[in-house]
From Swiss-Prot:
GO biological process: thiamine biosynthetic process; thiamine diphosphate biosynthetic process; thiazole biosynthetic process; tRNA 4-thiouridine biosynthesis
Binding-site list for ATP: 183-184, 265, 287, 296
Transmembrane feature ranges: none
A Pfam family reported for this protein in Swiss-Prot or TrEMBL: ThiI
Name recorded for this polypeptide: tRNA sulfurtransferase
Pathway annotation: Cofactor biosynthesis; thiamine diphosphate biosynthesis
Disulfide bridge positions per record: 344-456
Gene behind the chain: thiI
Job description of the protein: Catalyzes the ATP-dependent transfer of a sulfur to tRNA to produce 4-thiouridine in position 8 of tRNAs, which functions as a near-UV photosensor. Also catalyzes the transfer of sulfur to the sulfur carrier protein ThiS, forming ThiS-thiocarboxylate. This is a step in the synthesis of thiazole, in the thiamine biosynthesis pathway. The sulfur is donated as persulfide by IscS.
GO cellular component: cytosol
THUMP domain segment(s): 61-165
Principal subcellular localization: cytoplasm
Length: 482
């Protein structure tokens, strides 16, 4: 099988040296992602496209799906590459490929040609289109807005029959811009802002301020791992977790109620800036949107920025909540966000929307900054690829099984879309569907006299959720592996 990768248009207008660098980086990113599916595949770069050739037909859908999620790719063409002799040979091959698709449909033929030939692209379009129209009685030519467009590419003595076109996410290849550190909470905003910087070519590391215990961190780890695995797995990134409960406790004890929200955000920026400096990261990323909450007014955002020289990027600054939620739905983080607890908003009953710098600084003089230094020093830094392994160690008490007993039920915790695409059927045992994002509220409604074997495709989510359910007091859970 063969795929032709078309570049994001902004790449093609770069200078020659920059364009070559971007294409080289994108080629490496594609190799890094696809090697997990087929180690023998070939990735070949050209001036205006990249070819991917693979032998394992069983991995075709997985490879195609992975390509649509790699930043820097505008669209993917799945093609059949065959030799041809003349225009009539091109027509005959197109007829075999497209006959079924054109039955009862309007169509047109579009051809791109490279190389030396005794015919033009328009000649091929007319010849092939006329032939298809004659040989498929129910088909009809329509040059404007046809139901089916027959795409052909002719290059020297090779014909590319385009079997399908699939849109990519666009943007720049990861690694073409510098690293950033995303302040991730697991909610709608931080997930979308992280994705937007990945799509713009940045390697995104994650910094999480834990305000709600182990269950909260597990949830945010899931979001970060999902984003990395889906859009950024071509690169290694860090997940830094900072226990911010001592900082919140100090704020609650010593800071005036109205100033708490702004001061908490200032403390987070101070801490994140220290982490960024430690690892040589150029900028922070937040999901703040202008006026969304009290700490996100222009006055308050300026006061928050003033505590650090580190650049703070806010890709969602002009977005409304509905737009952000729609983006979260598109990238697959909506379900995570809907079940993620929100802690920041509860610490202040009457937050100021227009903080005064002198008052903020006066309140911060009461704060013991050694607490902030300590939590940053003790921050837990892991390679995001190790989250799955670390979770295995953390859930040692949760048994992993590949068999089942008479009282067992498999609980498929994948998202509904994944379950519909690849239904799970295991002979000899019932399979019940309960997506991971409903476990926290719906697991207790299940028959607690049964043993529930949590299953997901890679085993990461099932182990994380098993740990969460154990913490909630459910001991009738195991992790199931096929």
């Amino acid at each position: 099988m063969k795929f032709i990768i078309k570049l994001f248009p902004e790449i093609t207008i770069k200078s020659q040296s920059v364009r070559l660098r971007f294409i080289k980086i994108l080629t490496g990113n594609i190799r890094n992602v696809l090697k997990h599916y087929d180690e023998t595949l070939a990735v070949v770069r050209h001036w205006d496209n990249i070819e991917v050739r693979a032998k394992d037909e069983n991995q075709r859908l997985a490879i195609r799906d992975a390509l649509t999620r790699i930043p820097g790719i505008h669209h993917i063409l799945e093609v059949e590459d065959v030799p041809f002799t003349d225009m009539h040979d091109i027509f005959e091959k197109a007829l075999v490929q497209y006959r079924d698709q054109l039955e009862g449909k309007t169509f047109c033929v579009r051809v791109k040609r490279r190389g030396k030939h005794d015919f033009s692209s328009i000649d091929v379009e007319r010849y092939v289109g006329g032939g298809l129209n004659q040989h498929i009685e129910s088909a009809r030519v329509k040059l404007t807005n046809p139901e089916v467009t027959v795409h052909l590419e002719v290059e020297d003595d090779r014909l590319l029959l385009i079997k399908g076109r699939y849109e990519g996410i666009g943007g720049f290849p990861i690694g073409t811009q510098e690293d950033v550190l995303s302040l991730i909470s697991g909610g709608f905003d931080s997930g979308v802002s992280s994705y937007m910087l990945m799509r713009r070519g940045c390697r995104v590391h994650y910094c999480f301020f834990n305000l709600g215990g182990a269950a909260h961190e597990i949830g945010v780890r899931q979001v970060a791992h999902y984003l990395w695995n889906r859009f950024g797995s071509s690169h290694r990134v860090r997940f830094v977790a900072i226990n911010f409960e001592p900082v919140v406790g100090e704020i609650l004890e010593k800071i005036d109620d109205g100033q708490m929200g702004v001061i908490l955000k200032r403390m987070m920026v101070r801490a994140a800036s220290k982490v960024a400096e430690r690892y040589g990261v150029q900028a922070l990323v937040t999901g703040e949107a202008l006026g969304q909450v009290s700490s996100q007014t222009l006055t308050n955002l300026r006061l928050i920025d003033n505590v650090s020289d580190t650049l703070i990027l806010r890709p969602l600054i002009s977005y409304d909540k509905e737009h952000i939620i729609n983006l979260a739905r598109q990238i697959g983080t909506e379900d995570f966000a809907r079940t993620m607890p929100e802690y920041c908003g509860v610490i202040s009953k009457s937050p100021t929307v227009k903080a005064v710098k002198s008052k903020i600084e006066a309140e911060e003089e009461k704060f013991d900054f050694s607490i902030l230094d300590k939590v940053v020093e003790e921050a837990n830094n892991v390679d995001i690829r190790e989250i799955a392994q670390q979770t295995e160690q953390e859930v040692v008490e949760v048994e992993t099984v590949n068999g089942f007993g008479p009282n067992d039920v498999i609980l498929d915790i994948r998202s509904i879309d994944e379950q519909e695409d690849k239904p799970l059927k295991v002979e000899g045992i019932d399979v019940v569907s309960l997506p991971f994002y409903k476990l926290s509220t719906k697991f207790g409604d299940l028959d607690q006299n049964r043993t529930w074997l949590l299953w997901c495709e890679r085993g990461v989510m099932s182990r994380l959720q098993a740990l969460y359910l154990r913490e909630q007091g459910f001991n009738n859970v195991k992790v199931y592996r096929l």
